[in-house]
Amino acid sequence: VFPFLVDAAQTAGHLPLEPKKWGCTMLAMPGHKGLLGPHGTGALWVADGVMLAPLRQGGTGSASESMFQPRIMPDSLESGTLNLPGIAGLYAGMRFALAHQQEARETTAALCGMMRDALLEMAGVRVYTRADALLLSFNVAGIASQVVASALDEQGIAVRGGLHCAPGVHRFLGTLNIGAVRVSP
């Protein structure tokens, strides 16, 4: 099996996840974004037949007598004491996010659409996002994205300026030196 990891950081909790349909063998997602869990949590879906090497050995609750991790998932990756409060918080957040996913997606799409339309009317503003996206990226000509983000923050509008952990995308867009302003309603 050829390993194929999909990063669902901006997708999980907002759109249905279909890793088998997508042909991926692993799907990683943070808990604190669309899944509404606590910071420091996350999930890794691993397809049947894929075995990952553990980062640490020993201290597993399922084979305490062994110095090595069991060769079964998920036990193979779970050494030490699990973050049970974090897991419970992630579970509660996931339940809420998934129960309201359609409603949230419709509201987010409407907000993004209104903002995109308004930004496209402004002189000197370049919008990088497709019309059907659930987040929005833009720049104001001649003003660094971080400066725009700070100015909006002063008005009580929370956005993020910069490269958003995606230098390849910014290289493609020609914004590697300035980044972009990202709005995630």
Residue ranges and their predicted role:
Residues W22-S66:
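Active-site PLP attachment segment
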Residues G61-S79:
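The feature captures the short pre-catalytic strand/loop hairpin that immediately precedes
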Residues W22-M26, D153-G156, N177-G179:
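Glycine-enriched alpha-helix->loop->beta-strand junction motifs that scaffold or abut catalytic
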Residues A109, G113, G124-P167, F172-L173:
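Conserved PLP-binding catalytic core of the aspartate aminotransferase-like
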Residues V1-M26:
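Catalytic PLP-binding core of fold-type I/II PLP enzymes
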Residues H170-P185:
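PLP-dependent enzyme catalytic core of the Aspartate aminotransferase-like
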Residues M73-D117, Y128, D132:
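Structural signature of PLP-dependent enzymes
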Residues F4-D7, L27, L44, L90, ...:
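Buried hydrophobic positions in well-ordered alpha/beta secondary-structure cores of metabolic enzymes
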